[in-house]
């Protein structure tokens, strides 16, 4: 388990978050700080019709990730589907934390951009976030082990 302070992608807030973490660090390294891009419950239709953003989801996520990197953050929360394009453009050291992870036979519920743990690995996710797949399982520990093994390869 990892704990990352997160901020919604706004340049001034992101820079302030880094400054605060630097000023308050108690050891040699400050905690990692990541920003949130587009939630995995959003898709292109929501972007176009509800948020009125006239661009592709991939371009929006990459732009927000670029803003986060330029502000000095360590990474972003994004769909596994955008992880590879982020790493291709911003480098593998830039962290992608990817929710929306489901096993192949799971319901996607309200999520629109989901992948399996193995696909998240192939798409270069740095870390995965798994919720309902484990918490809704009849055997959460066995499900956790399966997810872990699938992600590790």
Give the location of each predicted region:
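Conserved beta-strand positions in the central sheet of alpha/beta enzyme cores
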Residues: 77, 128-129
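Internal active-site segments that recognize and position negatively charged phosphoryl groups
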Residues: 59-86
């Amino acid at each position: 388990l990892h704990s990352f302070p997160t901020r919604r992608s706004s340049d001034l807030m992101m820079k302030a978050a880094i400054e605060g973490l630097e000023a308050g660090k108690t050891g040699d390294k400050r905690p990692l700080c990541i920003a949130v891009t587009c939630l995995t419950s959003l898709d292109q239709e929501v972007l176009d019709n509800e948020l009125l953003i006239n661009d592709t989801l991939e371009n929006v996520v990459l732009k927000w990730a670029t803003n986060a990197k330029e502000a000095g953050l360590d990474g972003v929360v994004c769909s596994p589907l955008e992880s590879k394009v982020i790493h291709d453009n911003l480098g593998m050291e830039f962290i992608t934390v990817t929710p929306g992870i489901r096993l192949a036979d799971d319901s996607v519920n309200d999520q629109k951009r989901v992948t399996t743990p193995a696909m998240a690995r192939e798409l270069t996710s740095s870390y995965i976030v798994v919720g309902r797949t484990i918490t809704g399982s009849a055997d959460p520990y066995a499900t956790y082990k399966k997810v872990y093994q699938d992600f590790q390869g």
